[in-house]
Amino acid sequence: MDEESLESALQTYRAQLQQVELALGAGLDSSEQADLRQLQGDLKELIELTEASLVSVRKSSLLAALDEERPGRQEDAEYQAFREAITEAVEAPAAARGSGSETVPKAEAGPESAAGGQEEEEGEDEEELSGTKVSAPYYSSWGTLEYHNAMVVGTEEAEDGSAGVRVLYLYPTHKSLKPCPFFLEGKCRFKENCRFSHGQVVSLDELRPFQDPDLSSLQAGSACLAKHQDGLWHAARITDVDNGYYTVKFDSLLLREAVVEGDGILPPLRTEATESDSDSDGTGDSSYARVVGSDAVDSAQSSALCPSLAVVGSDAVDSGTCSSAFAGWEVHTRGIGSRLLTKMGYEFGKGLGRHAEGRVEPIHAVVLPRGKSLDQCVETLQKQTRVGKAGTNKPPRCRGRGARPGGRPAPRNVFDFLNEKLQGQAPGALEAGAAPAGRRSKDMYHASKSAKRALSLRLFQTEEKIERTQRDIRSIQEALARNAGRHSVASAQLQEKLAGAQRQLGQLRAQEAGLQQEQRKADTHKKMTEF
């Protein structure tokens, strides 16, 4: 409503109020007076609201008029300042000649005032950025990159010299991310040694827009982050949703189930889709790194004596085109090499060096098996290389161990005859090529001392495994007895471990029985052949 309509409405309300007051003075019934008094109160409240609206409309119109007149006034002020500067510049030499060094020209204060103005502008920019919500990167101690919602608390210079800001993470998942309660007040005594977060300096180029948590995708069975009593956000899974309240079960066995509201739950930071995308990127692009498995090492990888050595193919050096994204490996690291190359004038797609004749593709990094020392890796590579060469030079075996020249069968003795009769096979079946069921036992009869020693060693190792498994079963049963009626989750896991240990014990006992049977057969044959 404009100013005129508000004024007319205000006059109407005041006239109605006067009529109501006259009616109250006429001496009506008590019921009618109650209605009139209520109407009187409503009219007074309405008049106050209308007056407030009228004042705000008049204020806005005055501000608009001032804005229209401000450019002209600003030009007049600038012109006046220009005239003062000219007069000071003309009068300053004369004053200096007349009075020596009595006065200092105001022009000398120009740089100081300019510096002061620049500091004021920087202070204003810092005040504007302070409190802004952004999405900032966080590198965990094991090297993964995650983006967390954070709040800017100040501006600082980054490590590489670029413009940066100090941020505090809003949803801390670790104690090192939890903001220190005394930092913002300036009362923290530990400073850099504080176990809580005093903020992290992040480059402005790495910041992303703030992302509001989308709770619409959360349902029963979904993975999430839930806030615990310690103020940290832990990984959990939703078990029930009821009128905005979420029942979550934390992944950690040390934390119990909890019921939280919408402000205490978040979608996971890394969804399954993003993880699969990152995995596919890491496996699909072979120009960054190549993983060497512990079981299969080709001849080209035998030259990799340590993880820092690079395996470079001739096609990577000679090729003039780059098949990988520029600086794509820096997505998974803290590297700034791409930015340094760009500042030094490198153009994407060209080779390194002064005349752009260097390599185009990045160097392949060879990743050796985890948990192995360099000596073990070198020994494994050399062994597999020697085995591969020996396998290629070794001629194929054309004859069996017991074959005779000319194709004549081996001489048969009385024990072969007895074995054939006891096993129910026809004579000559061995010469026909069909392997008998007791061939392994027969080989054990004629085995050497080294084979029998190996059999005894296998039997001893199996007995040790049985004893170890029995000790594990006893310890699991004791743990079950301690946790009876306490933790259902821990009891269920212990039951699974107990069932697995009992299955393993049964397999080991069967293996022990088979080895004992073979050993008895070998001993029986030895006794029968001694006359």
UniProtKB/Swiss-Prot annotation:
A GO BP entry: negative regulation of transcription by RNA polymerase II
Zinc finger (C3H1-type): 175-201
The organism's taxonomic lineage, starting at the top: Eukaryota, Metazoa, Chordata, Craniata, Vertebrata
Organ and tissue specificity: Widely expressed.
Residue ranges with Basic and acidic residues bias: 518-531
Annotated region (Disordered), positions in chain: 91-133, 267-289, 385-409, 426-446, 509-531
Post-translational events: Ubiquitinated in case of infection by HIV-1, leading to its degradation. Ubiquitination is mediated by the CUL4A-RBX1-DDB1-DCAF1/VPRBP complex that is hijacked by HIV-1 via interaction between HIV-1 Vpr and DCAF1/VPRBP.
The name this protein goes by in its record: Zinc finger CCCH-type with G patch domain-containing protein
An example molecular function term from Gene Ontology annotations: zinc ion binding
Phosphoserine: residues bearing it: S373
UniProt feature coiled coil, ranges: none
Modified residues (N-acetylmethionine): M1
Subunit structure: Interacts with CHD4/Mi-2; the interaction is direct.
Domain of life, per lineage: Eukaryota
Location, primary (coarse class): nucleus
Induction profile: Down-regulated in breast carcinomas.
Pfam families with a match to the protein in the record: G-patch, zf-CCCH_4
Compositionally biased intervals (Acidic residues): 118-129
Classification via PROSITE patterns: G_PATCH, ZF_C3H1
Name of encoding gene: ZGPAT
Keywords, alphabetical: Acetylation, DNA-binding, Metal-binding, Nucleus, Phosphoprotein, Repressor, Transcription, Transcription regulation, Ubl conjugation, Zinc, Zinc-finger
Compartment(s) where it occurs, according to its Swiss-Prot or TrEMBL record: Nucleus
Function: Transcription repressor that specifically binds the 5'-GGAG[GA]A[GA]A-3' consensus sequence. Represses transcription by recruiting the chromatin multiprotein complex NuRD to target promoters. Negatively regulates expression of EGFR, a gene involved in cell proliferation, survival and migration. Its ability to repress genes of the EGFR pathway suggest it may act as a tumor suppressor. Able to suppress breast carcinogenesis.
Biased composition (Low complexity): 107-117, 426-438
